[in-house]
Amino acid sequence: MAVTYEKTFEIEIINELSESVYNRVLNYVLNHELDTKNTRLLEVNLLNQLEVAQEVDLFQQPFEELQAIHEYWRSMNQYSKQILTKEKVA
């Protein structure tokens, strides 16, 4: 599978976004001293899901799949902002 500039650029964007989203949720969990073993907590489940999603080998994915993965991380970015903000207000 050939690696093109466009593919490498897309992978770099995905990596930056995924790290940002994951770190936002991780910081929330740590700052609120949530039990990371308690899978009843939405934030902990989200953190676990994001951790698994980061394990995908992006260089093995076709460009079309990278675009879908990028959209997943955009959605998780918006979702994590919404739920973590709601938690702060509540």
Curated annotation (Swiss-Prot):
Classify the source by domain of life: Bacteria
Output the GO biological process annotations, alphabetical, semicolon-separated.
negative regulation of cell killing; response to toxic substance
Stored InterPro entries: Antitoxin_epsilon/PezA_dom_sf, Epsilon_PezA_dom
Q: SUPFAM superfamilies annotated for this entry?
A: Plasmid maintenance system epsilon/zeta, antidote epsilon subunit
What does the record give under GO molecular function? toxic substance binding
User: Does the keyword Manganese feature in the UniProt annotation?
Assistant: no
Keywords of the record, alphabetical order, are: Plasmid, Toxin-antitoxin system
User: Which is a Pfam family this sequence falls into?
Assistant: Epsilon_antitox
Q: How does it assemble?
A: In the presence of the zeta toxin, forms an inactive PezA(2)PezT(2) heterotetramer.
Tell me the protein family, please.
Answer: Belongs to the epsilon antitoxin family.
Annotated function = Antitoxin component of a type II toxin-antitoxin (TA) system. Neutralizes the toxic effect of cognate zeta toxin. Part of a postsegregational killing (PSK) system involved in the killing of plasmid-free cells. Continuous synthesis of the epsilon antitoxin is required to counteract the zeta toxin.
Q: What protein am I looking at?
A: Antitoxin epsilon
Organism of origin is Streptococcus agalactiae
